[in-house]
Regions:
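Divalent-cation
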Residues: 1-144
């Protein structure tokens, strides 16, 4: 998955979202066993539809799976849903604090520095769309 492919996926999730969109955090990784994650729900929903359709639906506030990060592999297939993601703090990360940031943003930027993580990305109404690679924000878009 290229950065452009990932950007397009994140944008499509946002476009397909409804008024109760809670935002989304996604980790692109083929080796999730190495990630500091924990399943927040203990179960997983039935997955039917494209990755963008499924993640857009799960990112509604009415979905019990809207919290945490979802994991996809480099082929864009969902491997894990609603994972608590607790990456270690990366001290030398440059964070643009002129925009509103929160826990999802910091987990995504720190988590992108974990070996085996190709990229992380977030989308939210208040923040926009961001992609992170190797502890750096490599793409930011305001959504309208």
């Amino acid at each position: 998955m290229t950065r452009l492919d990932f950007r397009n996926l994140l944008h499509e999730i946002w476009l397909k979202s409804d008024t109760d969109f809670s935002g989304v955090g996604i980790i692109v990784c083929d080796t999730p066993i190495c990630l500091p994650i924990m399943n927040l729900r203990g179960d997983s929903p039935a997955i039917s539809g494209t990755t963008a359709e499924v993640l857009s639906h799960l990112s509604r506030t009415e979905s019990k799976y809207h919290d945490g990060f979802h994991i996809i592999n480099q082929m864009g297939l969902i491997t894990h849903i609603a994972q608590y993601f607790s990456p270690p703090i990366v001290l030398n990360v440059n964070i643009d604090r002129s925009r509103p940031i929160g826990g999802r943003f910091t987990a995504a930027i720190f988590g992108s520095a974990i070996p085996g993580v190709l990229m992380t990305g977030i989308v939210s109404e208040g923040h926009g769309l961001s992609i992170f690679e190797n502890g750096h924000e490599t793409l930011f878009e305001t959504l309208k």
